[in-house]
From Swiss-Prot:
It comes from the Eukaryota. This is Class II hydrophobin 2. Residues 1-21 form the signal peptide. Disulfide bonds join 34-80, 41-71, 42-54, 81-92. Disruption phenotype: Does not seem to affect germination and growth, formation of sclerotia, ability to penetrate and infect host tissue, nor spore and mycelium surface properties. InterPro entries: Cerato-ulmin_hydrophobin, Hydrophobin_sf. Its main location: secreted. SUPFAM superfamilies: Hydrophobin II, HfbII. Aerial growth, conidiation, and dispersal of filamentous fungi in the environment rely upon a capability of their secreting small amphipathic proteins called hydrophobins (HPBs) with low sequence identity. Class I can self-assemble into an outermost layer of rodlet bundles on aerial cell surfaces, conferring cellular hydrophobicity that supports fungal growth, development and dispersal; whereas Class II form highly ordered films at water-air interfaces through intermolecular interactions but contribute nothing to the rodlet structure. Keywords: Cell wall, Disulfide bond, Secreted, Signal.
Amino acid sequence: MFFSRISTIVSMTALFASALAMPTTLTSRQDAICSSGNPQCCDVDVLGVADLDCEAPPAAYTDIKSFSDVCADVGKINMCCDLPVLGQGLICSSPDNS
């Protein structure tokens, strides 16, 4: 009985020590850039009402700058559109309010 308690204590200590010794890794995630809309890469913005030739960003982004860079890489501007319909964005705004 004494041996089983020592064995349990040693096992638990080893378990906790190995859990503490493992490094944590963080992965970047997308921020909520478009709080009330869908992120889109669009060709032309028409007075914030309609945007033409929109598509979902072709690559991952983590913040507004990287979202802008992803869209610029395909020759488009970054927009947040409330209603993306058939390649057109309706009621769109810039994610950085510029």
